C-alpha cells in the first residue's frame, strides 16, 4: 500500500495495512503515536454500551492493547462486552492488539482465586495463532505485575514466535513493569546490561522494544531511556521503541500526564503507551486526551477523535 502516517491515516487506510505496513506507518509518525491499554477482566467498562477501547480512540488514542485477555475462553472477557477482537477493530477502524505474558514455564493454575486467568494470556504458539486468526494487529510480549517474568523469558518467547510466525506478527517486546524480583529494562540497578538485552530482543526478531516511561517508573530518567532508544534505532534501523506510562501514575491528574508526556517525547521513542490503572479498566479518558495533545498537538488529536468512522 501507499506509505502513510498512522496519526493521519483514515479508517479505510488502516483497514488495509499489513503488519509491516502498520510498523512503517508508526515510524513515519515521528514519535506521535499514542497507545491505550484496556484491562478486560474488571468489567464492561467506564460507559455503558461503549467499550473502553472505543472510548480511548474517541479521546485521541491511535492504537489499543488488550490486557488480561482469556484466549482459551473468549466469552470470559467482560471488557469486550460480548464482542470478538475483530468486531471492535472493524467498528473503530483502528489497530487493536493483544498483550501476552511470558512467565516462567512452570507456571500452573494452582486452584487459588486469581483476578484473571493467567494461563489464558500466556504467549504460547497456540495463543499467537489464535491472535492471528482473530485479526489482532499486533502482539505485545511482557509480564504483568506479580507474574515473576524475566527479560530472558521475553527474549526466549520473542525468538520462538518470530521463528514460527515471522512477519505475520508485528511483535512488541520488552520489560516495563513487574520489577520486584528483576528490575525493568533501562533501570540502572538491573542485574543485566540493558543494551545487551535489547540486542538479544532485536536479534530474536522484535519489531518494537518496550521501555518504561521516565517520570512514571521510579528511578527511570529521561537521559537513560533516551540513551537506550538511540541504541534501539541504531542497532537495527527500522526497529521501533515504545515508552510506557504506567506504574499507577496513569491514574494521576492531567497536569502530571502532560509533564510525563514531554519527558516521553524527549526520549525519541516512536510509540507512547498509557496503562490501564485507572477506574473501570483503563486510564481516564481525560488522561488519554492529555497524552495525545501533549505528544502531537490539538489538530492531530482532534483528527483522531473525529475520524472514528472515516
Language-model segment annotations:
Residues 95-118:
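Metal-dependent C-N hydrolase catalytic cores
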Residues 11-12, 40-44, 116-118, 185-189, ...:
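Short, flexible loop segments at the rims of nucleotide/cofactor-binding pockets, characterized by
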Residues 32-41, 67-73, 113-114, 244-247:
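Short, basic, glycine/proline-bearing loop/turn elements
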Residues 238-250:
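Active-site clefts of carbohydrate-active enzymes
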Residues 76-86, 228, 266, 277-307:
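C-terminal helical cap(s) of enzyme catalytic domains, especially alpha/beta-barrels
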Amino acid at each position: 500500500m501507499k506509505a502513510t502516517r498512522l496519526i493521519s491515516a483514515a479508517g479505510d487506510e488502516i483497514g488495509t495495512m499489513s503488519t509491516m505496513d502498520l510498523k512503517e506507518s508508526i515510524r513515519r509518525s515521528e514519535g506521535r503515536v499514542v497507545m491505550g491499554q484496556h484491562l478486560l477482566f474488571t468489567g464492561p467498562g467506564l460507559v455503558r454500551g461503549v467499550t473502553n477501547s472505543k472510548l480511548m480512540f474517541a479521546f485521541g488514542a491511535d492504537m489499543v492493547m488488550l490486557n488480561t485477555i482469556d484466549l482459551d475462553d473468549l466469552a470470559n472477557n467482560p471488557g469486550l462486552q460480548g464482542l470478538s477482537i475483530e468486531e471492535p477493530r472493524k467498528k473503530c477502524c483502528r489497530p487493536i492488539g493483544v498483550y501476552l505474558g511470558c512467565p516462567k514455564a512452570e507456571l500452573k493454575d494452582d486452584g487459588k482465586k486469581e483476578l484473571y486467568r493467567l494461563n489464558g494470556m500466556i504467549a504460547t504458539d497456540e495463543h499467537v495463532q489464535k491472535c492471528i486468526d482473530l485479526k489482532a494487529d499486533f502482539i505485545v510480549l511482557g509480564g504483568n505485575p506479580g507474574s515473576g517474568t524475566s527479560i530472558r523469558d521475553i527474549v526466549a518467547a520473542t525468538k520462538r514466535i518470530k521463528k514460527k510466525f515471522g512477519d505475520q506478527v508485528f511483535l512488541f517486546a520488552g520489560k516495563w513493569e513487574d520489577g520486584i524480583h528483576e528490575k525493568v529494562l533501562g533501570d540502572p540497578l538491573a542485574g543485566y546490561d540493558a543494551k545487551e538485552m535489547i540486542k538479544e530482543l532485536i536479534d530474536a526478531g522484535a519489531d518494537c522494544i518496550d521501555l518504561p516511561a521516565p517520570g512514571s517508573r521510579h528511578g527511570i530518567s529521561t537521559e537513560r531511556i533516551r540513551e537506550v532508544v538511540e541504541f534501539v534505532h541504531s542497532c537495527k534501523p527500522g526497529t521501533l521503541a515504545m515508552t510506557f506510562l504506567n506504574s499507577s501514575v496513569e491514574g494521576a491528574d492531567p497536569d502530571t500526564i502532560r509533564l510525563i508526556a514531554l519527558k516521553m517525547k524527549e526520549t525519541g521513542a516512536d510509540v507512547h503507551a498509557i496503562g490501564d490503572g485507572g477506574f473501570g479498566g483503563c486510564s481516564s479518558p481525560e488522561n488519554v486526551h492529555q497524552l495525545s495533545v501533549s505528544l502531537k498537538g490539538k489538530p492531530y488529536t482532534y483528527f483522531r477523535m473525529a475520524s472514528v468512522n472515516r
